Structures are given as C-alpha cells and as structure tokens.
Swiss-Prot record:
RNA chaperone that binds small regulatory RNA (sRNAs) and mRNAs to facilitate mRNA translational regulation in response to envelope stress, environmental stress and changes in metabolite concentrations. Also binds with high specificity to tRNAs. CDD domains: Hfq (cd01716). Pfam families: Hfq. One of its GO terms (molecular function) is RNA binding. PANTHER family: RNA-BINDING PROTEIN HFQ (PTHR34772:SF1). GO terms for biological process: regulation of DNA-templated transcription; regulation of RNA stability; regulation of translation, ncRNA-mediated. Residues 9-68 form the Sm domain. This is RNA-binding protein Hfq. SUPFAM superfamilies: Sm-like ribonucleoproteins (SSF50182). Residues 75-86 have a biased composition (Basic and acidic residues). Keywords: RNA-binding, Stress response. The keyword RNA-binding applies. Homohexamer.
Amino acid sequence: MSKGHSLQDPYLNTLRKEKVPVSIYLVNGIKLQGSIESFDQFVVLLKNTVSQMVYKHAISTVVPARPVRLPSPSDSEHGDSEPGNA
C-alpha cells in the first residue's frame, strides 16, 4: 500500500470497527449520512437504510459524529489492521 494511505486507512477502519455514525460531504456539496460498512482503495460503502457505494474521488470531507482516537502504530501490529474487513 502506498504511503498516502498511512492515515486514511486506519482512520476509516476505526470508524468502521466502532460503527461511528459519519457525515460524508461530496465535492458537489451533497451530504450523506450513515456508518462505514467497508472500504477499499477506491470506494467507501456507507450504510444507512440502504448501502451506498461512494467513490473516494467524490468525497470532500468525512465528519464523525463523535471524536475518534486513532490507534498508535504499535497497536496495528497486534490487531486486525486489514482495511475494510467487516
């Protein structure tokens, strides 16, 4: 995985594992709400009443409903650090 994902993947994975409600703002201004079901290099699956596949290139901002603590680098060596796995 490229270095550009060193913050993005753990952040999205923490939001997914803790089922944190998020607001996702798209580049066109649309606001989507739900929880992150899964993600990969190109898309995020957002679950609310339905699941929506949102392309990352269309995302401007991800806003969690509550503060999120990112795992330290040593934490990822011990746990499930595989991106997107539910």
